[in-house]
């Protein structure tokens, strides 16, 4: 057995191994390829390498010595010859030998070609080894030569050689990096055009990071490449910054889902008519359905990760787009620049948003042409020149505000999203990235975990919430002023505000080109009166910059509030197009949506740096600082228009439609005016206490107008009736009679009596007696020497009674129409017509407005009611007083004091006849002007007053003949007949005291004395004594006039004796009844 061949074959397996086939040329994979070829051939011939391995493994297990390096064949032969237990089985060895021989023959037959190629490969390998040995020897010789050369070369030359070597390596590296970076410019525009901004930013940053390594420092071509990339970076920054502004302010017409969430709910206003009151009181603590949907949508958008946003298509959702833009800017280290740009553009973009929305409405409704509007309002408003809101104007304003506030809500949510995103950025920004505009990016590492980068710090760049609030408050304030506030209310159709066909830079709206040129800051103005100067400017502008000549809109142009200077003072510049004229009546369209937007803004901008009361404070500031003063000017202006009308205090031509008694035109107009204000300003009337404060002020002024009218009425009547009297005298003082009313002690009692629902007759009679007593005191000047009764202005041709009665009626109607809550059932008759009755309660619904805190306002209105009612009672009491003054004045005219000596004429005196004529005329006028109860109230107690006045005159007479007494009785009879026709409330018309004294006196002194002594009565004693004095004083005056002093003393003694006799007679009658 050729065991050596087997052993060598066993050991010779290594030539086909991987390590032994490594050629000196470095082809390390040669052995592997050979094994693969053999394996494939074995497989094709039906034998596998695995079968040979099993046979070899079996030989190694049973015949281990055969595979050893130091194998000795003789030892195996001895073992085979040994038959003892220590020997080996010879037959088994032969069996193995046969198997191996057969296997080798099979292998030799099968792999004959393989062995041939193996021998060839072995030869090639050995040749390669020899070549490698030759190279090693050559290298060794080169190293020895280099060492010898180095010994002869200085270090400077070596350094230069080393530097050149490094430069060559750097050039190779730069060329490789530049080759890869050059692909950036090919991919960048593709990514930007497809709006893959994040991937474009990531690409720029990665390339920049590679080129920013220290290996490339100082290489000119790299610096030039980076300079080119800086321009690309600036371009991308501009694109991202503009994209951020565009998305934030919805500059592109993209149907973002956020628009539907920010659209107002049309049922929101009707659900709570007191929304403005609750808003100003900060009672709207519960969020509405719309606010909840907005916040839910915002939370969902904020909860998304950057990876989720990148998976979605760009342009489908604004908040996700903003997230991608912010992350892209932060990746480039340009986020502070973008936020600063957004802050600086906030005011201008907010202005553009409002302006574009306004112009869209103008274009939609074609407001360039004159538009006629239909008047849907009551005639009263247009009678006094009010411009109330039409249906067309309401539609335009509502649509404008809906679109505007939808956009502004989106803007606020975008700002909220930006602020939230900036606190949770997932990308990294360079630590030392410059915040200056267009700054160069520093070296960064794109690895998010790199220590060279850090998160964006929002504290380094204050988020511009303050600028946002200032901008939208400015725009909203401007919008409110444009449509609610104006210096003068006017009636003009939309689009009629046209001054010229063109507008240039020097002919701004509202400016006169003859005064100033291009004066928009009020700081620098070129003033020139020369027409040639402006012609030359116009020529230059048309020639050099024709685009500056703008076609002027036919619509009205408002003003805009912008920030200027460090002080941020508000200045006015030309601004928005206003498609309807300003009017306080637009509040019903403007205020609801404005308040709802402010409520939503508080909900959206939930930030600790924003005061929660900013919206309420803003609305309060506008209402109290602008709208309420403007509303008062408006209300006051048209109130003055009503009251200054020449026919204000004249009967309304259709008074029967409103009242059962005649009333003035101004009272009807004022009630209609107040009613229209509440109808056309329902939001204001239901929510603002200030509205009722303004009404209260107007009511006070209305009361003053009526009071002045009453005073002027009396003064005019005095001057008309007594033209010969000097105006400086007290007789024509128009305040005397009114002062006489108010200063008298009976005045408050009369007011109290008239307020009663069912006044008693006894109480009225008692008041009449007190009144008569006070009048007689004034007549006798018993109070002070300065106060005296004024002259009555009543006459048969005077219209004073009518005017004062109409004032009384008008005040009664006004109070019943407006102040039914305070009447307390005191009215004696409902003077309202059926269409004017307050079936629903009071005209002024202050209870609904003020709730439990209405006591103060109720008290103020109660005071106005009391003053108006007192004025009404003043008018009635004034007529009553004038009638009494007329009687007192006429009676005094008929009696010459102290000597009443006339001839009996058989008819009443002329003054009495004029008095009766005036009273009859007055009564007839009162019958047509006043209710029956008020008319009788005027004359109630008059007969008692006349009787007391005549009785008082009797005691003032010093001498009187019988003819005078008969004339007085005739006058009294005529006055009684007239007083019976006026029909007082109760009682017979008679003069018991005056008729008694003048009736007895006509019998003469002798009969008077005899009759009294025969039947003495104590109650007649003063009267009889006065009769005796009057009789004998006349005789004494005649004796003194004739020089009969003795007779004078005799009559004097006679008076004393008769009076003593009367006293004794009365005393005796008392003792002997």
Swiss-Prot record:
Gene of this entry: sec8
Compositional bias ranges of the Polar residues kind: 22-33
Role: Component of the exocyst complex involved in the delivery of secretory vesicles to the plasma membrane. Also required for polarized cell growth and division septum assembly. The exocyst complex plays an important role in the targeting of rho3, as well as the two main hydrolases required for cell separation, eng1 and agn1, to the cell wall surrounding the septum before cell separation begins.
Name of the protein in question: Exocyst complex component sec8
Entry annotated with the keyword Cytoplasm: yes
Transport found in the keyword field: yes
InterPro entries attached to this UniProt entry: Sec8/EXOC4 (IPR039682), Sec8_exocyst_N (IPR007191), Sec8_M (IPR048630)
Main localization (coarse): cytoplasm
Residues recorded with modification Phosphothreonine: 449
Basic and acidic residues bias: start-end ranges: 1-11
GO CC, one annotated term: cell division site
Pfam families the record matches: Sec8_C, Sec8_N
